[in-house]
């Protein structure tokens, strides 16, 4: 009797377990929902031709810097007075005024169209390719426009003889009338005339200064000889 009762209990238990396994399994209350599977990332796009050209230009510039053919860009704040010590403060101010005059967009840059208008007003109009070539020659950050530093670099290269005589940048530098009255040069029409006259004035001043120093040395030598002669004469009287 006991064995039959035990067998019935086992049979009911097996049926209950089978029913639980075959039915839908509900998530317990309060259990966190399963996280959604992340979607696969789209494949990376192949580099475009413009990206290849930009990378090539950057590598080319790095080679120029390593070989000393180009100035490395500085991360610090640009200071024209320390970076271009050959220019006086007045000259830099005049060049800055000229830069702002043609910076019609007031964004701190002279773009292609603004450079086109500048060259037309200076009486040396350039073709579209000529304008792009002008910018490219001093465009150190490859942004296709001129910053104030790159604008000053034009005059630095011109003064150092690094520009072609028939280039657009040379025409810009020659035709830019800069007030250099406080450079110690009166009546100079442009930067190059000012540099020549400034060098002449400096040479003349150095010559006058050297002549004064030589005259002072000669007078001191004559005074020393007179004192020596007086001491000798005095010694003769005492003997």
Swiss-Prot record:
It holds the Pfam family EF-hand_7. Ca(2+) 1 binds at residues 103, 107, 114. It is found in: Mitochondrion inner membrane. The keyword Nucleotide-binding does not apply. Residues 90-125, 126-161 form the EF-hand domain. Acts as a calcium sensor for mitochondrial flash (mitoflash) activation, an event characterized by stochastic bursts of superoxide production. May play a role in neuronal differentiation. This is EF-hand domain-containing protein D1. It comes from Homo sapiens (Human). The lineage of its organism: Eukaryota, Metazoa, Chordata, Craniata, Vertebrata.
